[in-house]
Amino acid sequence: MLNTLFILAAEAHEAGEGGFGINLDFLEANLFNLAILLGIIIYYAPKTLGKILGDRRQKIADAIEEAETRQRKSAQILAEEEKKLAQAKAEAARIVQEAGQRAEVAKQEIATQTEADLRRMQEAAAQDLGAEQERVIAELKRRIAEQAVAKAEADLRDRLNEDTQDRLIERSIAQLGGR
């Protein structure tokens, strides 16, 4: 680059300019400046652009590789989760089936227990009925006995006068004393 600058400066000097000065022709000065800029760009641009593009290419390659790695991990995790989901569904189906079986067993046990309870209640009712009948019969016997005693007492009062009662008492005392 410096070589190019020296060459351009030498050519300007040989052209009679006598050195570096102010060139009032802006078009010519701009072309000269543009030529210098293009020279610098052509000399340094391939290295700098190559490095920038290489860095950019590497970043893109790294990003692609990272994305592919994440995609593989995601696919692996998805497969594992789908497997877990299938296992969970199978477990849920098994639990539902067991619950159905348990419900059926419980239903049968409840039906059996209900039948046994019903039989016990019927037997208890029959026993209660028998006990009630016995109680009623005993009550009737007691009432009949009371009525019979009352009737006998009434008959004795009517038949026994005071003399007869005295004789009966004396005879009873004599029987007790004569023993």
Curated annotation (Swiss-Prot):
Signal peptide: none
Main location class: membrane
Pfam families in the record: ATP-synt_B
InterPro entries in the record: ATP_synth_B-like_membr_sf (IPR028987), ATP_synth_b/b'su_bac/chlpt (IPR002146), ATP_synth_F0_bsu_bac (IPR005864)
Cellular localisation: Cellular thylakoid membrane
Function summary: F(1)F(0) ATP synthase produces ATP from ADP in the presence of a proton or sodium gradient. F-type ATPases consist of two structural domains, F(1) containing the extramembraneous catalytic core and F(0) containing the membrane proton channel, linked together by a central stalk and a peripheral stalk. During catalysis, ATP synthesis in the catalytic domain of F(1) is coupled via a rotary mechanism of the central stalk subunits to proton translocation. Component of the F(0) channel, it forms part of the peripheral stalk, linking F(1) to F(0).
Protein name (database record): ATP synthase subunit b
Organism (species): Synechocystis sp. (strain ATCC 27184 / PCC 6803 / Kazusa)
